[in-house]
Amino acid sequence: DPKFAFKLGFWHEKISPIPDFEQSYLWYSVSVSSGVYKAMKLRDRVGKEIEVEKIDELQNEAKEIITKNKYFNQQNTEENI
């Protein structure tokens, strides 16, 4: 769920006792790719705290999450038909 991904990003950035900007960036990226564009500004803000090389890894990880999520959503839809 894109809104849940947004909430995870926010939690890792602002609520967690130990902020984790990498996890925040990851979940904001998933959220943006799923259509929650207000997460873009937040993702870019936490991205300033992360090394460029790590951002590339996180973007690839976000793509994997999105791809797997689309696969499972498609499987669930086909099973319900």
Positions of predicted regions on the chain:
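Conserved structural position within tetratricopeptide repeats
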Residues: V30-S33, T67
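Helix-start (N-cap) detector for alpha-helical repeat units in TPR-like alpha-solenoids
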Residues: P2-A5, Y37-M40
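Hydrophobic face of amphipathic alpha-helices that form TPR/SEL1-like repeat modules
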Residues: A5-K14, D44-K48
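Short coil/turn and helix-start
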Residues: K14-P19, S33, K48, V52-I55
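Terminal, low-structured helical/coil segments at or just beyond the last alpha-helical repeat
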Residues: A39-I81
